[in-house]
Amino acid sequence: LTFDDGPYPPYTDELLKILEQRQVKATFFMVAENAEKHPELVAKIAAQGHEIALHALKHRDFLKLSLAEQQKDIAAGKRILEKLSGQKITLMRPPHGFRDWAVIDTLQKNGLTAVNWSVIPRDWTNPGVSVIVDRIMEQLHPGAIILLHDGDSPKYVASREETIQAVSVIIDKLCAEGYNFVTVNELMQK
């Protein structure tokens, strides 16, 4: 499980309770501006053993940024997340997943690996809990990286209540089917 655009209360808090109850680890791709506003959530995520990764300093389309702007965003975002979490940040998912070879090169120069997803239920559109769950189940495969959202761009945050409710159902269904949940770095090492 991966979560983008947070941390953002109350959704990240609710999500952490579910993950802790079910003893599931996840990877949180954070917008560093959101992390700065909610350092207590970053600390809580790290303390619970989840992986923290960079989504961006600001939630902007990297393909529309100059190389200098990309570098500045990545370096600042990484620095903020490492300071707040105490973790070494090694992964980044550019906003919207938009990337090209220049973006990938900039990430690599900053010690980061680009990560996208393989299951995308489009939860940010709030299609309903059952639709989110059904879309995940339809796309699911061993080694899947599931993209969900616990926040949104710093300027606007839609409700993530449907996502939070869907996470409980997803975890229970997938555990019943014999799936295990690991962080992205753990998955990459397998």
Name what the model sees in each region.
Residues L1-D61, E69, D73-K83, R122, ...:
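Active-site beta->alpha N-cap acidic-glycine motif
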Residues E36, E161-K190:
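C-terminal domain-boundary segment and adjacent tail
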Residues R60-L65, S153-V157:
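A short acidic, helix-capping loop that chelates divalent metal ions and anchors anionic groups
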Residues F98, V103-Q139, Y179-Q189:
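His/Asp/Glu-enriched short active-site or ligand-binding loop at hydrolase and phosphoryl-transfer sites
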Residues P121-S130, K155-Q165:
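Active-site glycine- and acidic-residue-rich loops that bind
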